[in-house]
């Protein structure tokens, strides 16, 4: 039997060896709520005081419908409002894409549809949120997250296809209340004597719907999202910012950004434009939101809010019929092709109906026109003898900004996307080839495909010099796929596997000449995200810029720059 002293010495040596072996791994992880490194209640209280009492102890919105904090009047409000996207954007404990609120373990959810006695799990909703109302409060929150090694989440509206606006055991900076809008008749770039004409500066929390209303009152519009509840300064613009049809006319949102005001990982406020910190400015115009810092204000070009005539050509048919694709769908794409050549842009949509049929439409916008009959005449002339198989309607818009709904519903959807080149789309056989390949994708009930019109100014904006994949400069259309996610247990995982393994290969097959996607509408499990979103050269440059500005990866976004160094939820390096 060993002497007691020797036994204790050996045990202490063993424990020390284990600690030294595990310490590097532990130091490469973010702090979790059950660990000693987690901030004390006193630390959170001090933070709350520094944030002017804007720190929120966060719970899922459905928690008021469950024991032990059941509050029936509050529950009734949540049930009534939960399908309103505009309402959800103002709730730090909710997301527009609501299935990302749930965790990936068994029953890690807090559902409005389950009984009040059922457990309400925190899921992927952060534990605390800094509901910031000033740049200084953003700086305070960033410094706190850095000092305490917390998993930091940036949340604007919750329009996010990859789950980056939420995360378990995380600390959220909620930018929704940074809602200032300032119009400039002739904006001067900060740090230079260069004036660039009309522009608008917007706070991080401004919604496109509100910006369109404000712009409509002053006679301007920006190249922005089709949904009123998308944030104008957040991940949409920082991810590239693809409008439905205005990109063809004025370029992407990122092309039109003049400067960013951003709080970096050190907590400093930086103004980035073409003359100041041009590396960061380049990265922010397509490198992805929540990656290089917290954008608190963005300034972008504005354009006249034109009147327009909107024309819709639609068809419904049997997806099993070859002629539906070779004539009906190809015809709709041919209309878009023909009008694009004339400078008129639009969008194509295809959807599965509950009756088992397929519906499809092409919407085109004739800018600076007011006569409906003139637009309808152009459409019928373009369709020729085939016009009889379609329903054609046109209506005049007083302004482009008026063509956006005030609200958008909650969604449970996954996205995928691919680019179609000019070479394919503009070729004589392009529309038929695309229609034929589209017929192989296989939509389920309620799923749909839509295009965003590129070409035009998107191709001509090479001077804008953004980090998006070089193929954007020679592409005609972005084709996006929207996949419904059931609320049943395990449905999200099944939908993700179907998207990655079955649907995305078929989507990429639309144009075999390239394999390029758009991160804002991309597969959240895209295995080749570096190559398809940015391309190897741009990605390497983005990684270097991130190392320069955020060497400790305080800002990590799923399938974002540097995310390959971290696990699924961004907690531990891999």
Swiss-Prot record:
Residue stretches making up the FAD-binding PCMH-type domain: 121-305
Domain of life: Eukaryota
Family annotation (InterPro entries): BBE, FAD-bd_PCMH, FAD-bd_PCMH-like_sf, FAD-bd_PCMH_sub2, FAD-linked_Oxidoreductase, Oxid_FAD_bind_N
SUPFAM superfamilies attached to this UniProt entry: FAD-binding/transporter-associated domain-like
Residues with attached carbohydrate: 48, 107, 193, 368, 385
PROSITE patterns, alphabetized: FAD_PCMH
Function statement: FAD-linked oxidoreductase; part of the gene cluster that mediates the biosynthesis of penigequinolones, potent insecticidal alkaloids that contain a highly modified 10-carbon prenyl group. The first stage is catalyzed by the nonribosomal peptide synthetase penN that condenses anthranilic acid and O-methyl-L-tyrosine to produce 4'-methoxycyclopeptin. 4'-methoxycyclopeptin is then converted to 4'-methoxydehydrocyclopeptin by the ketoglutarate-dependent dioxygenase penM through dehydrogenation to form a double bond between C-alpha and C-beta of the O-methyltyrosine side chain.
Annotated protein name in UniProt: FAD-linked oxidoreductase penH
Biological classification of the source: Eukaryota, Fungi, Dikarya, Ascomycota, Pezizomycotina
Gene designation per UniProt: penH
């Amino acid at each position: 039997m060993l002497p007691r002293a020797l036994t204790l010495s050996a045990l202490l040596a063993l424990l020390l060896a284990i600690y030294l072996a595990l310490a590097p791994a532990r130091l490469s992880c973010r702090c979790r709520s059950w660990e000693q490194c987690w901030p004390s209640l006193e630390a959170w209280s001090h933070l709350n005081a520094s944030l002017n009492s804007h720190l929120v102890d966060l719970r899922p919105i459905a928690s008021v419908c469950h024991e032990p904090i059941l509050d029936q009047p509050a529950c009734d409000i949540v049930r009534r409002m939960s399908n309103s996207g505009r309402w959800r954007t103002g709730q730090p404990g909710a997301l527009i894409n609501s299935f990302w609120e749930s965790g990936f373990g068994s029953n890690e959810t807090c559902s409005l549809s389950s009984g009040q006695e059922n457990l309400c799990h925190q899921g992927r909703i952060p534990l605390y949120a800094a509901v910031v109302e000033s740049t200084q409060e953003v700086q305070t929150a960033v410094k706190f997250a850095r000092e305490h090694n917390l998993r930091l989440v940036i949340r604007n509206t919750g329009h996010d296809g990859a789950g980056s606006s939420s995360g378990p055991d995380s600390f959220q900076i909620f930018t929704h209340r940074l809602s200032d809008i300032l119009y400039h008749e002739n904006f001067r770039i900060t740090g230079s004597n260069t004036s660039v004409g009309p522009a608008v500066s917007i706070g991080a929390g401004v919604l496109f719907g509100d910006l369109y209303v404000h712009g409509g009152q002053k006679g301007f519009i920006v190249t922005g999202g089709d949904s009123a509840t998308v944030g104008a300064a957040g991940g949409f613009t920082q991810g590239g910012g693809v409008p439905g049809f205005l990109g063809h006319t004025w370029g992407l949102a990122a092309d039109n950004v003049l400067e960013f005001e951003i709080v970096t990982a050190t907590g400093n406020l930086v103004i980035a434009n073409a003359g100041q910190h041009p590396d960061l400015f380049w990265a922010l115009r397509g490198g992805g939101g929540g990656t290089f810092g917290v954008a608190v204000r963005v300034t972008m070009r504005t354009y006249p809010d034109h009147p327009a005539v909107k024309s819709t050509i639609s068809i419904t048919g049997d997806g099993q019929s070859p002629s539906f694709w070779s004539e009906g769908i190809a015809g709709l794409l041919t209309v878009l092709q023909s009008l694009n050549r004339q400078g008129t842009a639009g969008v194509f949509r295809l959807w599965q109906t509950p009756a088992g049929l397929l519906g499809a439409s092409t919407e085109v916008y004739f800018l600076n026109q007011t006569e409906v009959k003139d637009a309808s005449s152009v459409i019928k002339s373009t369709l020729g003898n085939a016009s009889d198989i379609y329903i054609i309607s046109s209506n005049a818009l007083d302004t482009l900004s008026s063509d956006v709904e005030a609200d958008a519903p909650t969604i449970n959807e996954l996205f995928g996307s691919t680019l179609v080149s000019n070479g394919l789309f503009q070729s004589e056989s392009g529309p038929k080839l695309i229609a034929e390949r589209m017929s192989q994708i296989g939509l389920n009930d309620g799923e749909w495909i839509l295009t965003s019109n590129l070409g035009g100014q998107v191709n001509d904006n090479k001077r804008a010099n953004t980090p998006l994949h070089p193929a954007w400069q020679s592409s005609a259309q972005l084709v996006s796929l929207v996949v419904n996610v059931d609320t049943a247990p395990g449905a999200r995982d099944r939908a993700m596997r179907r998207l990655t393994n079955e649907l995305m290969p078929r989507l990429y097959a639309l144009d075999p000449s390239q394999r390029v996607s758009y991160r804002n509408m991309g597969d959240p499990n895209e295995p080749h995200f570096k190559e398809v979103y940015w391309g190897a050269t741009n990605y390497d440059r983005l990684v270097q810029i991130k190392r320069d500005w955020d060497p400790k990866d305080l800002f990590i976004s799923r399938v974002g720059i540097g995310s390959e160094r971290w696990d699924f939820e961004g907690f531990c390096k891999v």
